[in-house]
Amino acid sequence: MDLVAWLICIIAAIGFAFDIYELLMLPLILRPALTELIGSPPGTPKGDFWFGMLFYVPAFAGGIFGLLGGYLTDRLGRRRVLTWSILLYACSAFLAGFSTNIYMLLFFRSTTFIGVCVEFVAAVAWLAELFPNPAQREKALGYTQAFSSIGGLLVAVANGIAIDYAQHFPAISIPEFLQPILGGAIAPEHAHEPWRYTLMSGLIPALPLLVIRPFLPESPVWAERRKAG
């Protein structure tokens, strides 16, 4: 493979790994997040209601937009949709760490799932068109998707680091001018909550993407079809 093919495979592998990273994040942070935001952990009627909502609503939103992912990749291009979907779920995870209420957390978890589902469709389409040879295509898809299993390990490690070192991290706060828009401030006693840092670590996949993105070409198959009308 040439350098461009390697770069595309690297981005796809990072995307697949952090798909699982973002999805498995919720079970790790749910109990402390619910306890802080609504005062009711899972196991109480109110806690169980929001427990279900935080799984059901994002999954539903991701499923709907995942179905639209094929249309978006055909309409806008594989590279553009892949890039923006990764940025969407990475930034959504980061912003979820600033949640001041349960509705804000639900919204950003939903946009995280939307980004994950659309990214998966775009990445598979891009890889399939990058390797016209069936044997190479199968290997590329298999090896890059295998990185999904690493996502679960990474998020467990990130959550462990957040729990152990949260008090040493910068305090999480919301600028005063944004507090009326976002529904209030983060109380000082909650400014070092590990669950917030775990969510914010979801920004990580955006960093290599911003470096590599200028060197990534559009799918030649899609470009030819687009040119042909």
Located regions from the model:
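Transmembrane-helix signature of 12-pass secondary carriers
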Residues: 1-229
